Amino acid sequence: TAPSEQQKRREILQELLGTCHPMTGIEPDFHCDYGFNIHTHGLTVINYNCVILDTSPVNIGAGAFIAPGVCLACSGHAVDPGQRSQGIGTSAPITLEENVWIGANATVCGGVTIGAGSVIGAGSVVAHDIPAGVIAAGVPCQVIRPITEKDKIRPEDILF
C-alpha cells in the first residue's frame, strides 16, 4: 500500500497477523509464511524488507524496533543430508521481549528469546537466547556488555 493508505494498512495487518496491536507498523516489502503465528503486543516497528518465517509462534513485545532486512526464522532444515534431502525440517518459536531493538540485516533463529531492553547489532546471527538489558552482536551473536546509564543520549545531543 502507499504510505498515504494508513487505514488500509491497518486493516491488512489486522487480517494477516494472529495478534496485531494498533500501534504496529510494518513497512514494505514484508514477507511471512503464514502471518497468524505473528503476535505484536504494543508499539512495534518492522522496517523495510523484513522476513518472518512464522512456522511457529513469533511474539513481539511492546516497544520492539526491527531494522531493515531482519529475518526472524522459526524454521530450519535437518543437518543430516539424508534427512534434508527428504525435506525434513524443524520449527521453534521466537520471542522478542519488550523494548528490544534488532539491528539491520540480523537473523534470529528459531527457539531464541531476546530479553527485555536488549539491542542486537546489525548483521548478527542470533542462535541462542540473549539476556535482558545487554548489547549483543556478531556471528554467532554474543553478549558484548550490559546497557548502562552511560548509554543514554544527552538532551543536547538529541537530533529528533
Language model: regions and residue ranges:
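An accessory alpha-helical subdomain
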Residues: 1-12
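Flexible, glycine/small-residue-enriched loop-and-beta-strand segment within the central core
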Residues: 3, 30-40, 45-113, 139-140, ...
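N-terminal helix-cap/turn-to-beta initiation motif at the start of protein domains
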Residues: 16-17
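Short-chain dehydrogenase/reductase
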Residues: 101, 119, 135-137
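Extended beta-solenoid/beta-helix repeat architectures
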Residues: 113-115, 130
